[in-house]
Amino acid sequence: MSNIKIAGIGAYLPSLVVTNDRISEFVETSDEWIVQRTGMRERRISEGENTSDISTKAAKLALERAGIDAKDLELIIVATISPDMFIPSVACLVQSNLDASKAACFDISVACSGFVYGLETAKALMMSMNYKNALVVGAEVLSKVTDWTDRSTCILFGDGAGAAVLKRDEAPGIIKSYLRADGKKGEALTIGATDFDTPFSKEKKLAKRTIDMNGREILRFAVSAIDEAVTEVMKDTNVSFDDIKYIVPHQANYRIIKLAAEKLKLSEDKFYLNLEKVGNTSAATVPIALNEMYEKGLLNKGDKIILVAFGGGLTYAATLLEW
């Protein structure tokens, strides 16, 4: 069995719903202004659950649907830019929560591209290490790194987690991936980490520990990145756009997806969107959307879909897979 397939999908969203009207109570904005510029109406916000907590809840659902016991997991990868702490990794915390004692564990920091990067990373390790199964999680508690006085960013982000269990299978699964980055544009989207203030530093450097984003630069990059990644992941596969049931994009902003669809000369109906209710949950957007599609009965065995994402780094990626 040389193919790697998604065997189970799961997601978890905090219960607190924060509407645009609620945000307008503490920054100068309105529901109309936010919807017009982003397509978003509400997002979920954690009231205390950390990244490992929501990751574990999404993972348990994915494992249940895959019919795999956590004790049999051989690999756990968590994609996040909002970990509980620097060390241990969120993946190690999830391993402990699940009692998945056999699993190798690590986090990847690829921002909004993280889940797509994680799938291909897990596939490669499963092939090279002969693992039978793996867990890939995209999870964020972005509310703790959001500047709630910055109207340009606080309207965008939400909290949530999505998880996929991968297993070896005779049937096709992950067909091809395309991973890229442009580090020269990295300053367009940043979150500071720690202050540089030691007895040996020449000057004190204070980190801005909240999201700082150049929205215009990200929009230009994102439209081009989606076009390139989707086009490249289709090359040499004998798969046409007519064969693709859905493209599942990172849910960053409706305008980005609209412009990308136009550039690809595809109908917007080909793109699955749920940002209106969930907002931008960074590495979690793609698996949360996949989980929603699964629960709505939109994904059938043999369906071909493309996952495409872009984000901090700057990074971008796409995966062509068969459900």
From Swiss-Prot:
Region (ACP-binding): 251-255
Free-text function comment from the UniProt entry: Catalyzes the condensation reaction of fatty acid synthesis by the addition to an acyl acceptor of two carbons from malonyl-ACP. Catalyzes the first condensation reaction which initiates fatty acid synthesis and may therefore play a role in governing the total rate of fatty acid production. Possesses both acetoacetyl-ACP synthase and acetyl transacylase activities. Its substrate specificity determines the biosynthesis of branched-chain and/or straight-chain of fatty acids.
Classification of source organism: Bacteria, Bacillati, Bacillota, Clostridia, Eubacteriales
GO terms assigned for molecular function: 3-oxoacyl-[acyl-carrier-protein] synthase activity; beta-ketoacyl-acyl-carrier-protein synthase III activity
Family listed: Belongs to the thiolase-like superfamily. FabH family.
EC number: 2.3.1.180
SUPFAM superfamilies linked: Thiolase-like (SSF53901)
InterPro entries cross-referenced by the UniProt entry: ACP_syn_III_C (IPR013747), ACP_syn_III_N (IPR013751), FabH (IPR004655), Thiolase-like (IPR016039)
Pathway field: Lipid metabolism; fatty acid biosynthesis
Annotated signal sequence range: none
Name of the gene this protein is made from: fabH
Record CDD domains: KAS_III (cd00830)
GO CC annotations, alphabetized: cytoplasm
Name of the protein in question: Beta-ketoacyl-[acyl-carrier-protein] synthase III
Catalytic activity reported: malonyl-[ACP] + acetyl-CoA + H(+) = 3-oxobutanoyl-[ACP] + CO2 + CoA
Free-text comment on this protein's domains from its UniProt entry: The last Arg residue of the ACP-binding site is essential for the weak association between ACP/AcpP and FabH.
Organism: Clostridium beijerinckii (strain ATCC 51743 / NCIMB 8052) (Clostridium acetobutylicum)
Pfam families: ACP_syn_III (PF08545), ACP_syn_III_C (PF08541)
A GO biological-process term: secondary metabolite biosynthetic process
